[in-house]
Structure formats: structure tokens, C-alpha cells
Amino acid sequence: MLRPAPKVDLHSGLSHSISTDSLAASATAALEGEYIEPIFVDSNREIDDIVRNMLPHFEGRETEHNWIPREKSMETLRKLVRGNAPQAYSQHFLVGIKSLLDGILKVVNSLRTTLSTAGCLFLQEIAKICGPGIDNMVEMLLQNLIKLCAGMKKISAQNGNATVDAIIQNVTYVPRILQHLSFACQDKNVQPRLFAAGWLKTLLNKQARHKSSIEHGGGLDIVEKCIKRCLGDPNPGVRESMRGTFWTFNQIWPDRGEE
């Protein structure tokens, strides 16, 4: 059932920004700025019913017949995550989202800009609201989203960038996240390398009070290699972005920064 609720700003968490063209900015802003009325549920069964009704829409490839139901499903999920389900029925809600994850990623990778954007915004919202609750989805999410960042469509790449940033900022840090950033720093496409500097800065700021989590297991060496690699990147934008990340690194580990 639907009940009105105060508007909550879920889009203020980016620790860095990359300039976009006006089309990309306006397309994303149109969806970010809309008011989404939350769905409030009264039982686990309601969540089950919502998820079960969506599953058929995500089967197979995107077609002229299923893209609109997929878009409506994303609208429903964005309403659901803003309601009481993530708090009152957390475990059941997250199990339901996990069962829909393949379909959600199909939406994220859609060539239809508004559909893909809706998928990315949902992932940003669930990362900010559920945080560590989506830890078991992070590997699959980062694999897909970093690949999205390498695509030719600038709007989709920018959405992927913002979504990766939101995930890194809100989930539990594990060394595998740093591995993904290292791979992005070496990507043959310039956009993941450009974005990786911002993602790394977000990660460093997040873990600044828990430095040992990065220091253990060789993580600090990986960070240094990422910084050195991008500071020597042939693309000036990548070099410039990583300079800001270096100064963040230098504040946290001044002895290593001076080397």
C-alpha cells in the first residue's frame, strides 16, 4: 500500500565529481530530481508477491514487449527501497533483491537511456539505504558497472561511475574492491581509468580511520601502484584526477607519500 512520506535526499553522497555534457546531466537529473512515493509493506508475503510478479519481466533478452514492464518494475523497486521494507523486513527484502539481481543488471545494461538510468539510480539508493546489507552482491555489481563505465554511451558511463562510487562508499570494505579498482586503472578504455581515481579517493576517505584494513594483505602496495600508474597515464585527464587522490593518500600515509 502507498502512504506519503517526506522527501529524502539520497544523492548527496558523491565525494568527487566529473563534468558531464548537458545531455547526460539533464537526463540523470530528471530521474534524480523526481519525487518517488515510498511503498510500505505489512508482511514478508507482500515482498514475496512483488518479487514474484516481477520475475517474468526479466526473463530473456530485452524486447519491445518487456522493456516497459521492466521500467515499471524498477519504479516499484525504487519505491520499495524508500519505504519500510529495508528496515522492517530487511533479510527478506534483501533476499528478494538478490533473486532479481540478474534482471536488474539487464536493466542497467540496457541501451535505452532512461531504463538504464533507473537501474543505476536504484542501485545507488539501495547502497545508501542498505549499506553492508548488499555486501554479498558487490562482486557482481562492480563487475557489471565498471564494464558499463567503459561503454561508448556517455550518460550510461556517468551513471555507472556514480553507482560504483555509491557502492564503495557504503558497503563493507574487502580487499576484492581494491582489486577491482586496480583493474580499472589498467583498463584499455580511458573512462574507467579516469573514474578509478575518484573511486580510489572515495575508498581512502572512507577507510582513513581504519587504515589497517588497507595496510593488511598488501593493499597499500596496490594503492601505490594505482596512483603511480595513473600519474603516468598518457591521458592528461587521468593524471589530473589522480593528483587529487594522491594528496588524499599523502594525508593518510605521509611517510609513503613522500617516497
At which residue positions do the language-model features occur?
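Alpha-helix boundary/capping and short turn/kink residues
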Residues: 113, 131-135, 154, 190, ...
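Helix-loop junctions that connect tandem helical modules in alpha-solenoid scaffolds
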Residues: 4, 15-17, 56-66, 103-112, ...
